[in-house]
Amino acid sequence: MRFIEIVGKALTEISGNLAKDYVMEISRFHRIQASPGFHEAALFIKDTLAELGYEPKLHKFPADGKRVYLDGWVAPIGWRVFEAELKVTKPEKVNIGRYPEIPTLVIARSASKPDGIEAELIDVGTGMFDNEYKVDVEGKFVLASGRARIVHEKAVKERGAIGIIIYNEKLEVPDAVPYVAIWPTLDEIDKVGLGFSISYRQALRLKNLLKRKGSLTVYGMVKSEFFQSHLEVVEAEIEGSLNEYVLLIAHLCHPKPGAHDNASGSGLLLEIARALQKLIEKEFKLNLGVKFLWVPEFYGTIAYVDSYKDSIRNIKAVVNLDMVGASQEKTGGVLTVVGVAPFNPTFLPLLAYYTLKESAKPLRYYSDHEMLPSLKYTLVPYIDGSDHHVFIDPIWSIPATAYTEWPDKYYHTNLDSVDNLSPKILKIVGSATLALALYLASFNNKSLIESVCICDSVARSYVEERFLELLKDGYEYASLKLKYLGKWMSEAISSLELLVENPKVKEAVIKRSREFKEYVASKASALARLKDCGCIKTVKIKRVDDTRVLMRTKKCPLHLGNVLKRLPKAEREYFIRYLFVERKSFGHDIIYFLFDGKRKVTDVFEEYYAHYKDADPDTFTRLVDALVKTGWLKEQS
């Protein structure tokens, strides 16, 4: 069956309304990792799958605050919250909020003070740097805009504050209360203070009261507890003729309501599971099986991979659903397909983009039904930040991509509600995902030839679009970018060879990859001609001169928090300022996966610079040195 026919079948079977119903049910649970709310949500997923005819499994991995998975990620400890309240008591009374009325009011893994406590409130700016603590905060609450874990360390651990009250001044919606968490290990829970999160508008009110009244007393009460728990992963599968799988994954965690992030992905995955059953009953036979996973983001995925290393090798492709189905008019987002990874270039993002493009066409293209809405979507350079990143690690080298919408003005707040989701967009993304899974699971020589043509076409369009943008970046950088785009995309096309046994088909894959390299070479020649006629500026290329050859020591994604907490104060504060005050990115997760133990640091920087033109050589060098110092990288002898 041709790809376009499979897309039509998927569009006919997937229901956006059913998907939204599943999302609504999931959004009723307060789904903090390793909490009772997550457990209840996992049981809902498991029970629903059983009703659909699956035989689901509920995997449990210790979440005790001390277990280390894949030699780099310490499991969170279980935590639950029962009730909480925050209010100003003096010099006037102001009710700020209560839990569970505001699900994000309590910082996840806050300490418990069931009888409550009154204390003075001190504004400490970001609260992340020593020079902001101009007065003694011992026994007091601090109001801060910085990262909760860092503020907690500075205010509570180092200075004896009672607790922290966090706000985010960068939120687009000033009345939204952000989701905030700290992640204490087992040996740190006795040092945890109270933690609250408030809206920016509430923070401005407190700041104004402090300015007018001189001092404020606030009352904070949290009834919560830490306990030994589990990271729970729900798994279901439909077997194919081979003991190999296409994996569809979504993270189930995040606080109530967490509709877009990520009840949307989890609910849509249930609908895909339902629709897949129906299509297999009607007409499809699978070579590869299709496996479904619902996980606590990163932590659960890493624990699962650590526990099932052998079976992970049987996964041939991974599609991650993380924040899908939002009404773009409401949230302001664009649906993105996570692109080709520089450290593991594969065909899957190119195929996923084409599938989405076909699924986003008017439904009447396939039938006489209603039109689908217009959709903003794009193929973006590789980004990490979700569970696909665990599988695409060069250690496993599994083709992986994700459908994800970004930005979202309600992201990680109490206003991330089901009302912001669109059944029609859920239908488009669900159809694309289902069609992609079916196509991959029923691969044959004919479909492989079709895939080569599709991937080549998408890759050429991607380069053409970026070529015009590159003209603005100067000849030297444009040449560097083209060099690596040619490398990444040709390797992505040739990765289809791994699925091929027929010699003629394999030859066709290799030929198309070679032709793509020739195409990119022609673009480089065109660039040189533009330079010769003075139509493009010249620029100085950034460089890092470091001949060391370094390799990873961990079989997991980089845990930056683990690195920062082990650095000397001055070095730690450099990264804190860079990331959380200047709000710059340095792609630490991508950089880590580029270290293969074969190339010089100079060459790793060059490839990362080609991926991200704003790469800063000094920050890159500092990061590399920090990773060596903390044992995440080691020098090859």
Region locations from a protein language model:
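Charged, amphipathic alpha-helical linkers/stalks
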Residues: S422-L498
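Metal-dependent peptidase/peptidase-like ectodomains
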Residues: I14, G195-F196, A203, N243, ...
